[in-house]
Amino acid sequence: MTDRQTDTAPSPSAHLLAGGLPTVDAAASREEPKPAPGGGVEGVGARGIARKLFVQLLGSSRSVVAVVCAAGDKPIGAGRSASSGLEKPGPEKRGEEEKEEERGPQWALGSQEPSSWTGEAAVCADSAPAARAPQAPARASVPEGRGARQGAQESGLPRSPSRRGSASRAGPGRASETMNFLLSWVHWTLALLLYLHHAKWSQAAPTTEGEQKSHEVIKFMDVYQRSYCRPIETLVDIFQEYPDEIEYIFKPSCVPLMRCAGCCNDEALECVPTSESNITMQIMRIKPHQSQHIGEMSFLQHSRCECRPKKDRTKPEKKSVRGKGKGQKRKRKKSRFKSWSVHCEPCSERRKHLFVQDPQTCKCSCKNTDSRCKARQLELNERTCRCDKPRR
């Protein structure tokens, strides 16, 4: 091989900077570097290859790495002479190499900051020694001739033993930092995925206590105890308790009271109160267009209840013994009026206290009069017998 062929041969660093990372066999990566015939070390070495594979796995942009490394490196054949093709190291390059060896493994790997983990600086540091590595075999092959120099160039990427040792000391530390970061990143990603998966399922199939109770079957004993005759809270209309106070509007119009309610075991029995008590509540009384105030009103409550036989309300009255005197005549007249009033239907089921019924004709009339409603600037509603606001 001639001098021109050796000068024009592609350098390994140029191939690396072009973007193509080397692919290494698994068996070759476990082999130890072999000594070259012209001196130096043959091959890149297992640790250098592993470092390049880590950079490739991290997915760093090869174009950015190539630009960064090309900006900082010089051509490989810049120091060679045109006539002989041998590299002239010079005193300046030797001084720079000695300074780099004194700086330590971190400068050899090109790490600038402790937080730089992308591995781009490591590739640049590997390419720079690879470009300067042919200096040792070139210097060693001068007395042996061109054959030894050609064998040293064909052996791959030779490196000096001192530089290989510094790289081997710094490589595991850099790789461990990268692996720690990758593991932590994977752990956080898995935790986030598990949280999102759990949140998705919880929204898709919500389970509440109300839905579970809606499908629950209530047992027979619970139904029996709840429906049996007992005092239970009931909403009672105030007008039902105070039928004479028709000039007021009450707020609220009904109050919660404990009243006897429920079922008995026999249809001939009914639930009736056996113990009663009074309770006082504050109710707002409103006189339309006049005044309103909060007053106290007393209501009747049931404390205890029992099932007792029903009273026969349709039972005919016993005939009174005929006798002489005015008292007997009055009783007979009252009984006649009662018998006649039985056939009359009630005027209203809800507001009986607002109507007056004639027992003979069963005609209903209002207790309120039109003049009484006009005195309050209201109008009498004959259908409901209440004083309502005038319509405009």
Swiss-Prot record:
Sorted UniProt keywords: Angiogenesis, Cell membrane, Cytoplasm, Developmental protein, Differentiation, Disulfide bond, Endoplasmic reticulum, Extracellular matrix, Glycoprotein, Golgi apparatus, Growth factor, Heparin-binding, Membrane, Mitogen, Nucleus, Secreted
GO MF, any single term: signaling receptor binding
Induction comment from the UniProt entry of this chain: By IL-6 and FSH in vitro.
Disulfide bond entries: 229-271, 260-305, 264-307
Annotated region described as Disordered, given as residue ranges: 1-44, 73-174, 309-337
Tissue specificity field: In developing embryos, expressed mainly in the choroid plexus, paraventricular neuroepithelium, placenta and kidney glomeruli. Also found in bronchial epithelium, adrenal gland and in seminiferous tubules of testis. High expression continues in kidney glomeruli and choroid plexus in adults.
InterPro entries from the UniProt entry: Cystine-knot_cytokine, PD_growth_factor_CS, PDGF/VEGF_dom, PDGF/VEGF_growth_factor, VEGF_C, VEGF_C_sf
Record field: compositional bias (Low complexity): 121-143, 158-174
Coiled coil feature spans: none
GO cellular component term, pick one: plasma membrane
PROSITE patterns linked to this entry: PDGF_1, PDGF_2
Start-end of Basic and acidic residues biased regions: 89-104, 309-320
GO biological process, one term: positive regulation of sprouting angiogenesis
Bias (Basic residues) ranges: 321-337
Pfam families per record: PDGF (PF00341), VEGF_C (PF14554)
Known glycosylation sites: 278
Family under the similarity heading: Belongs to the PDGF/VEGF growth factor family.
Name under which the protein is recorded: Vascular endothelial growth factor A, long form
Primary gene name: Vegfa
